[in-house]
């Protein structure tokens, strides 16, 4: 048993020393997709938005067939929409905004096409998602109603997603990537009726650019 622990510690020290770490930051566009299912009927809606992120790239292996590493990060995601109508001379305004804090932990494979100039990569892994706020706001010239879905309805703020994507690194400094995070958990937290199962699943498509320090 002692020998086993010694091997684990030695392996961890080797990885810590051998791994090449690199900090990166990025911004981009995202499309938040929500699918609501009641019984056998589904309805989907989408919100446009943006994200800001920071990530750390740990290259664990660097071989002729490519590189393999782990890429943990932290990402702020915003998405929303607003609309305005006039009914019987009264202007009504409604808006929905979603704020998320995402923690992706990706396994990343890269292949160098042109030395120090062009690297293509693919990545996949879990994304731990925390809903910070889901604000629904309605107003007229005389009144304003504002609710937070996480506090005022049966909408869960936590989600576990599986993220997949591909990207390109340019000159070891710049990167472009596109991906999708598939939500696994049912975000509806209320009481269920057998004949009318209620489900809410969210997913996020994104495309962005980044800079590696």
Regions found by a protein language model. Name each.
Residues 21, 44-50, 97-103, 156-162, ...:
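Residues that define the transmembrane beta-barrel architecture of outer-membrane proteins
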């Amino acid at each position: 048993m002692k020998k086993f622990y010694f091997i684990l510690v030695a392996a961890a020290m080797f990885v810590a020393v051998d791994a090449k770490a690199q900090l990166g930051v990025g911004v981009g566009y995202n499309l938040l997709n929500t699918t609501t299912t009641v019984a056998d009927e589904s309805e989907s809606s989408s919100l446009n938005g943006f994200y800001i992120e920071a990530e750390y790239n740990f290259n664990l292996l660097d071989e002729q067939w490519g590189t393999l590493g782990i890429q943990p990060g932290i990402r702020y995601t915003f998405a929303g929409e607003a609309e305005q109508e006039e009914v019987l001379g009264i202007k009504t305004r409604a808006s929905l905004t979603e704020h998320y804090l995402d923690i992706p932990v990706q396994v990343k494979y890269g292949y160098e096409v042109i030395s120090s100039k062009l690297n293509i990569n693919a990545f996949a892994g879990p994304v731990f998602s925390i809903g910070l706020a889901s604000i629904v706001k309605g107003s007229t010239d005389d009144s304003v109603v504002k609710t937070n879905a996480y506090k005022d309805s049966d909408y869960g703020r936590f989600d576990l997603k599986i993220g997949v994507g591909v990207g390109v690194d340019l000159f070891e400094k710049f990167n472009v990537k596109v991906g999708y995070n598939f939500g696994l958990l049912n975000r509806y937290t209320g009481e269920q009726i057998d004949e009318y199962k209620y489900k809410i699943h969210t997913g996020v498509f994104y495309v962005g650019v980044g800079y590696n320090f």
